Amino acid sequence: MEELRVLLTAAGCPGAAPVIRQLKQVDERSIEIIGTDIDQYKIGAHWCDRFHLVPKGGSPEFIPRLIEIIELERPHVLLPQSSAEIIAIASNKELLEAAGTKVMVASEKAVKISENKDELYSFFKDSPVKVPEFRHVSSLEQFVSSSEELGYPDNPVCFKPPFSKGSRGFRILSDDVSRKEIILKQRPFSYFISMNEFMDVFGKDDEFPELLIMEYVQGVDCTTDPLTRKGEVLLCPIKSRHNERCGLPMKFVQVESPELLESTSHIVKTLELDWIINAQFIGEYLIELNPRISTQIFAPGLNIPYLAIKLLLEEITPDEVRDCSSKIIIGQTSVRYYNQIFFDDN
């Protein structure tokens, strides 16, 4: 088969290394990977065939730089991996494709709803998809009153900015957790914060941030990672997440969940999502929706990023993708670990 060139953005993100490795291990053709990142000291700079520095996704120079790289490298496919870049890429899909590639991204509307948790929760409120009860606040007074409406201080509540990557800005507001225990017995990264601590930070701040306050939901932490096309789920691995460290789960286990599959199918259909997405659930509650690839569990014979690329290039049909569902192995486990590379920086 013809050699394939893939432009992989955010080639230093936590899920990049296994995606690069799995694409390079494809047997039926040679795949050349061109990586981009905002930092030259990332794994992608060493594992990709070629590597280019880019500005941050919110920079006005980001899209022109991507176009420059596309015109230079002539990739067949652009595969985005970062929430910080996905809105810019979706908003400029036509420009990027005019430069000479196919872009694996959902519609601009679907991406913007997915990335804004206020819009996401509002969109699915009173739908078959459960979302936490929430309030959007922009002042200290609203924060305090909304926290009380959601059950604080008798029950903990959560908050985070409507736009944020992963666990950035996420905290659990609770006065029941010992500060002494957090300092002496927990890792330095703790989600818990008391109202007094919150007041110390924001009480005298003239510019109160936009925040989303949510009820504190509990249950098994799972994500679904469907490959979708035109609002339809073609196959959908579901994994539980364990052993979180610094905001990243370190272990994943492939599981079955008809309920989460049904919720994911409704999400995909309603938003008319495309390609690989990632939906995070706590119990039955949708917590986060990433309209991009996230950490994958690779099973023998099942390489979802490569399937998505072939589907985008019309080398396979949706039915052929559906047939691959039988290759999802329940119980297949992935453990994330730290590794190192060594190089001469001269």
Specify the residue positions occupied by each region the protein language model found.
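Preference for protein termini
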Residues: 1-36, 73-81, 129, 185, ...
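ATP-binding N-terminal substructure of ATP-dependent carboxylate-amine bond-forming enzymes
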Residues: 1-105
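Residues that mark the start of a beta-strand
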Residues: 3-7, 156, 212
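ATP-dependent carboxylate activation and anion-phosphoryl transfer catalytic cores
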Residues: 4, 10, 73, 242-246, ...
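Active-site nucleotide/adenylate-binding loops and adjacent lid/helix of ATP-dependent enzymes
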Residues: 111-210
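Phosphate-binding site of ATP-dependent enzymes
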Residues: 184-249, 254-263, 267, 283-285
